[in-house]
Curated annotation (Swiss-Prot):
The gene is pgi. The active site is at E282 (proton donor), H303, K418. This is Glucose-6-phosphate isomerase. PANTHER family: GLUCOSE-6-PHOSPHATE ISOMERASE (PTHR11469:SF1). It comes from Mesomycoplasma hyopneumoniae (strain J / ATCC 25934 / NCTC 10110). HAMAP family: G6P_isomerase. GO terms for cellular component: cytosol.
Amino acid sequence: MSLKLEVKTEIKLDYQGFQNQINEFHNRINDKNSPDINFLGWNNFPEVAINPQEIARMRKIVENLHQNSINVLVVIGIGGSYLGAKAALDFILGLGPFENKPEVIFLGNSLSSTDLYQKIEYLKTKNFAINVISKSGSTIEPAITFQILYQFLIDQIGEKLAKTRTFVTTSIKSGELLEIAKSNELEIFEVIESIGGRFSVLSSVGFFPLLFAKINVDEIIQGAIEAHKRYSTSSISQNLAYKYALFRFLMYKNFNYKTEILISYEPFLIYFNEWWKQLFGESEGKNLKGLFPASAIFTTDLHSLGQFIQDGSKNFFQTIIYIKKPKFDLGIKKIVQFNTKINKLSGKTVSEINFQAFLATTLAHSSYGNNPNLVLEIADSSPKTFGHLVMFFEKACAMSAYLLGVNPFDQPGVESYKNELAKNLGWDR
């Protein structure tokens, strides 16, 4: 898979002056004696992250579900427990709608009673299975949703059958969800202890929903393996993941930019952007440091944010993911009855015009708007490319956080709202 990185800014950047720091942090990421080794399972790829026996078991389970006309899987999880899988599905399949294909629905990622009610109403006419994903089982959003939905499934088909359609992805060492799964004889998939939620899509956390949707997981793994090898050097000039990390750091530290906007030109990348926001937001946003991760979809958001980006305050830079080959394309035909200027575009395709919009917008924002732009060009939106891109960003994120001087693998600030909510509810977490 080809990934190109191009910087579009008048700012002069000195990368080589940071090579010694990069070497130090590269060793910290890759050394088996690293002080962070208990959080680096995602980087020990595929040896730690991939369990071939578990994937084979998942394949058999999915095949059995499909043979029994169970064509809807409800994935219950929040944060890294669902964002990676949702990002992968949309990235690889597009947004549909799809007919006569397995459907994956995501719940447990909010406390909206309306959303939960409406999706349960939809499920009343469906044969569905449940995959609840939580390392501990004590996170309130998925815990509540699982309790309600599992009882709903029992009411629909009975407890005995409901147990055969409920799958638990959790820690195999301890936790409330593990105890529930064991006491109710539910199928268990492992959440690997050394892989944090936001780094977990390339593991059992992401694979079961993807297999259910008939995604080629082997190609995702292959793309990630290739990226892991490609970005295994500490050389800034040869490692684009580290070059991206250093670009971000310099924008923040040397030029006082406070926000990075990840921009895509395809709506099916909305949830990839959301996954990226969690990855960098939770990894870097601590000790009063870090770039604020924002996102936009162009050309849609040019009609809402375009004015601000062009002429507003200059406290942000843009990283653009551009996909060279679209999934599908449509030609524009001339309509004689339409005496409009659009007729002059007949003979072109929609993707050609989207590409020209990308070129024009990048030029306008970088040259006239004085916003630094970093362009990541990827070949396509295949499973292999998805795996590659995930590994690219995960490696870049770890390096970026180390450059910033923060721990990439904890998220202590998240506990504050959880603790206050528990107090409000009189709930012992």
